[in-house]
Swiss-Prot record:
The keyword Kinase does not apply. The gene is Su(var)3-3. PROSITE patterns: SWIRM. Residues 123-138, 861-882 have a biased composition (Low complexity). This is Possible lysine-specific histone demethylase 1.
Amino acid sequence: MKPTQFGGSSSKMTEPIEYVTLISDDSDGEPTPKRNVNHPPSALSAPNPGQKQKHPDEDSNDAPATSDERRTSRRNRPKVDYSNRPSGSGDTASNDKSGSASMGPNNQQAERRSQSQTRKSEANATSSSVSGPSAGNSRPSQNGDSKDRDAGTPTVLSGQEGAVFQSRLPFNKMTPNEEACFPDISRSGILGHRVFLNIRNSLLHMWVDNPKIQLSFEIALKNLPPPFDSEPSLVRRVHSFLERHGFINFGIFKRLKPIPAKKLGKVIVIGAGISGLAVAHQLQQFGMDVIVLEARDRVGGRISTFRKNSYIADVGAMVVTGVYGNPMTILSKQIGMDLVPIQQTCPLYGPDGKPVPKEKDDVIEREFNRLLESASYLSHRLDFNYAGDCPVSLGDALEWIISMQEMQVMHKRGQHMQEIIATQTKIIEQRRRLKTLRDTIGKLKNEHLAMINQRKPKGTDGDLKYCYQEFNIRNTQIKMEETISTFHDLHAEEKQMLAKLHELEQNRPSDVYLSSRDRLILDWHFANLEFANATRLNNLSLKHWDQDDDFEFIGHHTTVRNGYSCVPVALTENLDIRVNSAVKEIKYGTKGVEVVAENLKTSNSQMTYKADLVVCTLTLGVLKVAVAHKESQQSNTVKFDPPLPDWKQQAIKRLGFGNLNKVVLCFDRIFWDPNANLFGHVGSTTASRGEMFLFWSISSSPVLLALVAGMAANLVESVTDDIIIGRCMSVLKNIFGNTSVPQPKETVVTRWRSDPWARGSYSYVSVGSSGSDYDLLAAPVIPPSSKDAEGLPRLFFAGEHTIRNYPATVHGAYLSGLREAGRIADYYLGYPEGTPPDIGYSVAEAANLVSVGNVVKLRDLSPNLSDSSPSSKKSEENSNSNTADSTELQ
């Protein structure tokens, strides 16, 4: 999650990188959106189909290897409007309030490498939107404004198409999960598909248009246009399917039908973070008895908001990373989240506190993106992912590329010096020849003059001697003239050589690839990328670190003015949540589960809870402690009985869990530019590059939030608050002056790694891991005592570390909760309402295909975003029988 990706520099490098010649410089440019005349006016503009694609890896979601969003291929993405607005109303939509369904478009550029990105900013403890990919990727432009950002953005989607896009589903074809749950429709041919898709898309449109009120079957049937309302049984099935899997009727809304009084099963949810609250809320709506156990004295987990007097600051998750397709957009309409788009200007200040010149910043940012492109090229094109038997990290690859560039610069310097020496040698030799010719000319001139002076008149010594005398005079004159001509030619050549030597001396190559100052600015971008991934670059998998980039949401990245904690607080409505209850042991078997929890307010007071199943939303950091096989008295050590299967434990160990910390500074007045949400500070050393490298100002109140990433994020956990605050103040005074910066009134320093209930910030794909580990972490566990290998799972998992396509984000954690609620309902409640008994599909098989939020890549969400690469065309041909023409679905 990756950071937000912003526009890259358009500056030209004075000298291209030799080994990157296969990567076009055009990767920094935006492709011009193209209209598809075969589709209705509301259709999306498609990205340039000529962009290169990287071949997908068999066990990963590797995105196309364009130059990369973080990675730096920038892709135009569509804007979405969910109202029945004419396609020409894009300008109006862009002026809507950020909290509405049709938020202003942002020309987000998902860079596959810059990670920066973009990127994982959120599910966890601290994230934001700079870098990046990603996305990764690059930092906000210093001179960007909203008009420039929106220029050239694709057309807004409206109506059904916009609602389906918001639901992360393809508009004109069934998903694998839908085909599994509707096998009769899947086999019925194109007409049956059209009927299904029209019903499904209409229901999604009804829900997205008004998510504050329950969309009941009766209302849905009443509002369906004919002839689709003529099959109430199919409408009921589609409605039940969408409701079960979290596409409609999720979040906080007014129920028109009461929750079933008879409870259909008992569930224990461990953790009241966003994923735990999502699954608990859904299962309660489904009629199950749910208890939530939370070790903290509050809900929200890594969503935590500091509130004191008029000061508000999110010390955990902070940014809504893209509004189109994001379930947080629906929640914002339900609970009054005050979403504020992030301004993209981000001035950068050097170690001396002086602004970094824009030209220099542009050049270094461009080089940063090219380095990421080169790393992607090494991994995905050259398959250079191992050094011997050891997997290569992104950090290693980047440093190797920099070293190769340094060697290339040294080689060029050597070549240049050799050329100078060769030219100087030629000039010396030329001057020797000129001196010889000059002497020869003088000698011939003297001989010629002597002959003239000694010349005898004709007839004095006879005709023969006279002729001989004249011959010698003329011959000497000819030799002298020829020698003078040769001298002039050589002198002209000497002038050319001198001009060439002067040019060589005036155009000496750089002494180094990066000067010490340039390297520090590059390190700022690396720190930004480390912030996006919550870890040092040396810990990231070279091949898979950005495996989720193709699924990033588009649109503005926003902050929540009234604090992100308003979301988990709202989701606690009518839930039975036991705070201060630290789970110590989870026992699961074929007959049910038992969870032993300790009440932290009354020491040594333990309670045992029994249920049919348990949903574990413990963070990956806490799970790592649980499977470490070390006896520990830590308060957050959880024991699984029986132990988790080896495949689950190995995935927990392989996947990385990073750290990112924040420093909140509350002042009595604003002394920085109130129009800028961000400003960066370049560290004085590579080792300290992540130390207070970025400052956020996300509200109208005088509050600054400093980010501490990479190596520095772990170091600050062992340092006192006074030292950290002092360092922050030193940086600010260096930038704004001693007299301009007052002492803070309130301060907060986070230490997420030391937090016993978090053990870090959010997940990342570490060296030796891949996207498939997210799938393994998401898989439910069947008790080993079960005689049936396909027995009933009793242990389920949710959280940002369990969702492959949206890891390290709040929306990913929330979607994982919806996913598990649907999976549990399939296993324990049976077929959705209205499903015929002879439908011919296994409910367990359907449960295994549950994929809320894991449906398709962004480019597959609309017929106008289809990929024209050969591989995608082949895939399209193979699925033709399951695809309905979008023009016929209107």
